[in-house]
Design a protein with these regions (language model features):
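N-terminal Lys/Arg-rich, disordered targeting/topogenic segments
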Residues: 1-11
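Phosphate-binding loop of NTP-binding sites
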Residues: 4, 48-50, 55-56
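Active-site-adjacent loops and short helices of periplasmic peptidoglycan-processing enzymes
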Residues: 9, 37-44, 55-220, 227-233
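Hydrophobic alpha-helical segments, especially transmembrane helices
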Residues: 9-11, 21, 35, 111, ...
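Penicillin-recognizing serine hydrolase domain
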Residues: 13, 41, 70-71, 76-80, ...
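Hydrophobic membrane-insertion alpha-helices, especially the h-region
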Residues: 15-27
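Hydrophobic single-pass membrane-insertion segments
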Residues: 27-41
Length: 304
């Protein structure tokens, strides 16, 4: 998964700040805008830098004329195959590119895993013991992991934070087991919840986003999912957290300090006008680099 792809190539994350527009490159990208006058965000790779001034002017016009404007259609000059830019406060799409076409969501899937786990009502201090039979398949598949070991006892909170900050497949597999008994049952739960949210072109097969041809979504559906996730106070706190230390146990006497992957990747790309709040990255060979994120502007921003 994405944590094993640390180098940034031409299709990796690249950022440009021109005037008031934040431009971020990824293979599939969605940013949720949370204030009326917030600058628009969009996928962009370094190869498109020469065209950004024209694009910027068009996007700013789209963001300041909600009554007359229609979503800006991003062209093939933007390397990202899928994009969806949404002003949540006004419930208005600012720009999109193939926003309703199917794509592989990779670890953005873990937003749904987080939401269902937080909605389960399970106590944060509920213990969970890892076993080798669960961890070995994840290692074989090359899934990103927090680093939990066989026979290690952790808490439900550790699993929640580990699933997002470290994008840990070990944490998400454990969450699926705790919430629904096994991952297959949890995937059915994920699909039912997706229908409830109006994610009608999404189908989940697993809790982590490991590639499967039948595991797909759209940029629009991921936007809906992120909005709903942010309405949950616990989910929002986790998605906005920079650093977390897991509980102490016999395997890790001092706990493990885990840091937000998405924040580490975004730390060099912070515009003055917009405050990046958090989100979820993703990567598989089939999906490419992915990002679902949210930002706010102003000291008293609108939105959830």
């Amino acid at each position: 998964m994405e944590e094993q792809k640390n180098k940034r190539g031409k299709v990796g994350l690249a950022a440009f700040l021109l005037a008031d527009v934040l431009l971020i490159g990824a293979a599939a990208y969605m940013i949720v805008m949370r204030q009326q006058d917030i600058p628009a965000g969009v996928s962009l790779s370094s190869t498109a830098a020469a065209t950004t001034e024209t694009w910027m002017a068009e996007t700013e016009a789209a963001s300041t004329e909600p009554e007359e404007s229609v979503p800006l259609e991003l062209t093939d000059e933007i390397d990202s195959r899928f994009a969806y830019v949404w002003n949540v406060t006004e419930d208005r799409v600012l720009a999109e590119k193939n926003g309703q076409e199917r794509m592989y969501p990779a670890s953005m899937t873990k937003l749904m895993t987080l939401l269902l786990a937080c909605e389960s009502g399970i106590a944060m201090d509920t213990p969970y013991v890892f076993d080798k039979d669960m961890l070995d398949p994840l290692i074989a598949q090359g899934a990103s992991r927090v680093g939990f070991e066989p026979e290690e006892t952790v808490t439900f909170a550790d699993l929640l934070y580990g699933s997002i900050l470290s994008s840990g497949g070990d944490a998400t597999a454990a969450l699926a087991e705790v919430v629904d008994g096994d991952e297959a049952s949890f995937a059915k739960h994920m699909n039912r919840r997706a229908q409830d949210l109006g994610m009608f072109d999404t189908h989940f097969v697993n809790a982590s986003g490991l590639h499967d041809d039948e595991h797909y979504s759209t940029a629009r559906d991921i936007a809906l999912l992120l909005e709903k996730t942010l309405e949950n106070a616990t989910c929002r706190e986790i998605l906005s957290t920079s650093v977390y230390t897991t509980s102490r146990n016999s395997v890790h006497p001092n706990g493990m300090e885990i840091r937000s992957v998405v924040e580490l990747r975004m730390q060099d790309y912070q515009p003055e006008q917009v405050k990046f709040q958090g989100g979820k990255t993703g990567f598989t060979d089939q999906a490419g680099y992915c990002l679902a994120s949210f930002a706010e502007q102003g000291s008293d921003p609108k939105g959830a």
